[in-house]
Amino acid sequence: MTLLNTLSNFGGTWPRLIIMSMINYFTVYQCTIPGTNKVYVTHGGSMQACTELLNGTVTILRDGYYITNLICIVVGLFLYFGYLKRKILHLQSLPISSWRFFHFFFTILAVTSRAIYYKSQNWRREC
């Protein structure tokens, strides 16, 4: 149970790391330093140097959330129409018997039990 919980935590953690990194990468910051006419524009990274070392103010020019959201939507559409839709239509075309969980095992069991039954019938006839 602990291993399952660990795998579940990993499954929910790494996508969040990727999304947050993309948001940070696509965000554009502007650092304005008071008393000078200098303005620094950067994207990604931390703006702590602007606020702590230079006593500047940080303004967000472009929020990376919207670009990341658009990228995820486009990737999702490509995945759906490129792969998932075909797979879903294939699964919908399967007969109901193939959806049963133990269908394969019950088929093998039925064939095996019939073979054993017929073998025992032939054994009785030989005696």
UniProtKB/Swiss-Prot annotation:
Subcellular location: Membrane
Gene Ontology, cellular component aspect: membrane
Keywords: Membrane, Transmembrane, Transmembrane helix
Recorded superkingdom: Eukaryota
Main location: membrane
Regions crossing the membrane: 64-84, 101-118
InterPro entries with a match to the protein in the record: AcetylCoA_trans_1-like (IPR024371), AmpG_permease/AT-1 (IPR004752)
Cysteine-cysteine disulfides: none
Gene Ontology biological-process entries: acetyl-CoA transmembrane transport
Pfam family, one: Acatn
GO molecular function: acetyl-CoA transmembrane transporter activity
Membrane topology: Multi-pass membrane protein
Keyword Acetylation set for record: no
Protein name: Uncharacterized protein YBR219C
Organism: Saccharomyces cerevisiae (strain ATCC 204508 / S288c) (Baker's yeast)
